[in-house]
Amino acid sequence: MTVETFKPKQTTTLDTPAKRLEAASTNAVTTGNRIGFVSLGCPKNLVDSERILTQLRIDGYEVTNSYDNADLVIVNTCGFIDAAVEESLDAVREALEENGKVIVTGCLGAKENQIREVYPDVLEITGPHSYEAVLKHVHKYVPKPEHNPFTSLIPQTGVKLTPKHYAYLKISEGCDNRCTFCIIPSLRGDLNSRPAGSILDEAKRLVESGVQEILVVSQDTSAYGKDKSGRTDFWDGMPVKQDITSLARQLGKMGAWVRLHYIYPYPWVDDLIPLMAEGLILPYLDIPMQHASPRILKMMKRPGRVDRQLEAIQRWREICPDLVIRSTFIVGFPGETEEDFQILLDFLKEARLDRVGCFKYSEVDGAVANTIAELISEDVKEDRYHRFMELQAEISAERLARFVGRTLDILIDDVDEEGAIGRSFADAPEIDGMVFINGETELEPGMLVRARITHSDEHDLWAEVVDADTQD
């Protein structure tokens, strides 16, 4: 969807449904040491789940998608906003009812007392990215097998919960910003960037395994390397600067689509746009702006010069005309007046953003924003949300219409009896629109095809595959 509201099983900018690992070909051998796994929340959490699952495989455990067959269940939780907390607690409850032996990890795990008050029978609780602690607890309750029949079956890239043709690449943990509506720093700590060489090694393995699209994620992607104090790392025998522009340039040389998510609006974002214009990385910018009223942005502790943001958008589009901009906004923030909201609507009209998500402010336990001003009534929040959505739907339809008649590369995600479903450079998986190619039932997921866009609406595109000699 181009414009969406928050639903359970969804995060601030990316919609990642709860996933139980499907027992695939690597489950062919029965070990008697079976672990069930439920992963909730954002793509960053999904990467954490993949790391835990990979180590479980290395340690010889079988991962099952059945509560009944599991000797223990791990629930990797989200705790960002109240709806996510509710979903996580529901998942813990279900795991306890269906199995009884549960380890909880992830963001909500940082609030152990909140979980224990409701579910005191949970075996163990750990916070986010506590991989070693989770594995230690698993070994305690389900001893590690002496013989590991899975070692030769573990992919070089580790266990992945995404389709084979795309993968999330997490480049850092934590965040140094202190947005008043957010509690991520208290859950995941300050910025901690991975070494550039380690990131590039992982990216290379992903591409060699057949991954066609790398989705770069973190809490604050554009801040990558700020904590490295200018230190250079090495990769493939060559020095690599540890900043987001240098990292993106190296990733762009690997032959896969590179899509950047969670770009905080720092001034040096300007340096990324030429890479998009050159075709090194996708011309797609996920840059959460949150609001447009200077007063509200100040209360949020976000950058507050809307005029500069509009100038930047114009500048970026002049450099890279195909640029697609995704953003997210909060309506009904404490203290938001009708005048503040109108400033936001005026900003949308002028900015003409491509993809936009809207959230009605929700109190988050521990967030400063809950007490800085009078809370907005649910009726007012609902009214502003619908007005926001209605306006942005018109803008999104207008922006998508510019693709009609053009021929684009389409990455196929799924094929059914009616045809193929894919995405263009303008579409991130699960949160943006899709490209429908009716009648093309012979295509396969992971294929990259050229297709001419024939129709559009406010969310999606329709296309037909073209031969090489008829392409634009």
UniProtKB/Swiss-Prot annotation:
Q: Which residues form the TRAM domain?
A: 401-467
Q: Which Gene3D superfamilies match?
A: Methylthiotransferase, N-terminal domain, Nucleic acid-binding proteins, tm_1862 like domain
Q: Where is the Radical SAM core domain?
A: 161-398
Cellular localisation? Cytoplasm
Record-linked SMART domains:
Elp3 (SM00729)
Q: Which GO MF terms are attached to this record?
A: 4 iron, 4 sulfur cluster binding; aspartic acid methylthiotransferase activity; metal ion binding; protein methylthiotransferase activity
List cofactor names only.
Answer: [4Fe-4S] cluster
Write down the chemical reaction(s) this protein catalyses: L-aspartate(89)-[ribosomal protein uS12]-hydrogen + (sulfur carrier)-SH + AH2 + 2 S-adenosyl-L-methionine = 3-methylsulfanyl-L-aspartate(89)-[ribosomal protein uS12]-hydrogen + (sulfur carrier)-H + 5'-deoxyadenosine + L-methionine + A + S-adenosyl-L-homocysteine + 2 H(+)
Keywords of the record, alphabetical order, are: 4Fe-4S, Cytoplasm, Iron, Iron-sulfur, Metal-binding, S-adenosyl-L-methionine, Transferase
GO:BP terms for this protein? Answer: tRNA modification
Which EC number(s) does UniProt give? 2.8.4.4
Say which domain of life the source belongs to.
Answer: Bacteria
Q: Which InterPro entries match?
A: Elp3/MiaA/NifB-like_rSAM, Methylthiotransferase, Methylthiotransferase_CS, Methylthiotransferase_N, Methylthiotransferase_N_sf, NA-bd_OB-fold, Ribosomal_uS12_MeSTrfase_RimO, rSAM
Q: List the disulfide bonds.
A: none
| Domain MTTase N-terminal, first and last residues per copy | 33-143
How is its cofactor bound, per UniProt?
Answer: Binds 2 [4Fe-4S] clusters. One cluster is coordinated with 3 cysteines and an exchangeable S-adenosyl-L-methionine.
**Sequence positions that bind [4Fe-4S] cluster 2:** 175, 179, 182
Residues binding [4Fe-4S] cluster 1 = 42, 78, 107
Which Pfam family, any one of them, does this sequence belong to? Answer: TRAM_2
GO CC entries: cytosol
Q: Which PROSITE patterns match?
A: MTTASE_N, MTTASE_RADICAL, RADICAL_SAM, TRAM
- Protein family per UniProt: Belongs to the methylthiotransferase family. RimO subfamily.
Q: What does this protein do?
A: Catalyzes the methylthiolation of an aspartic acid residue of ribosomal protein uS12.
Question: What's the protein called, per UniProt?
Answer: Ribosomal protein uS12 methylthiotransferase RimO
What organism, scientifically named, is this protein from? Shewanella putrefaciens (strain CN-32 / ATCC BAA-453)
Which classification does the entry list for the species?
A: Bacteria, Pseudomonadati, Pseudomonadota, Gammaproteobacteria, Alteromonadales
Write the gene name: rimO
